Amino acid sequence: PAATEDWIKGMVNNLAEPVFSSDTPMIRAVAQGQCGVALANSYYLGRMQAGDKGEADKTLSGKVTVRWPDPVHVNITGGGVTRASRNPEAAQRLLEFLSSDQAQGGYAAANHEYPLKGIGEDPVLQAWGPFNQAKVSAERLGELNAQALELMAANGWQ
């Protein structure tokens, strides 16, 4: 935890602005020169680059470059069927559809999030190049979440 505490303190001390309410204003701040770097979910930049957020944001997004840490953390979107489901068969069919080539391709194109591996990707995403995904399980991240939040609070993260 000592190295983690040092990293958190360094992040807090290096903030050019208070923590932003979401990733879009943070990306705008980088594009406008208020910040030199930001850690953001990539799909926010994808929406801006595709013009989903309007022409002003599309223009601003052209001033931002994606750099992948090595390795990079990857958020996942998941689904499941609980024992309490009143219609587990339909719920299972929905999950199967959502993981199909058709749904994943549409989701990537509409939202600029990475689809399941091997399914057609959005041109915006392809332009950013490959990345090396961190080999940490979602289960392990969940196990460490409370400790991480405690370390953040104890070291000035707000």
Where would I find each of the regions flagged by the language model?
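Extracellular/periplasmic catalytic domains that process cell-envelope and extracellular macromolecules
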Residues: 31-32, 58-60, 72-74, 86-89
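Solvent-exposed loop/turn segments at secondary-structure junctions
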Residues: 43-46, 71-73, 86, 100-101
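Periplasmic-binding protein-like
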Residues: 97-120
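Short helix-loop capping/hinge motifs at secondary-structure junctions, enriched
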Residues: 1-3, 85-91
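Ligand-binding pocket segment of bilobal, Venus flytrap-like solute-binding proteins
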Residues: 1-66
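A bilobed periplasmic-binding-protein/Venus flytrap-type ligand-binding module shared by bacterial periplasmic
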Residues: 75-87, 106
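Solvent-exposed, polar/charged alpha-helical surfaces in well-ordered, non-transmembrane soluble domains
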Residues: 9, 24, 28, 32, ...
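An extracytoplasmic/periplasmic, membrane-proximal ligand-sensing/linker region
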Residues: 115-158
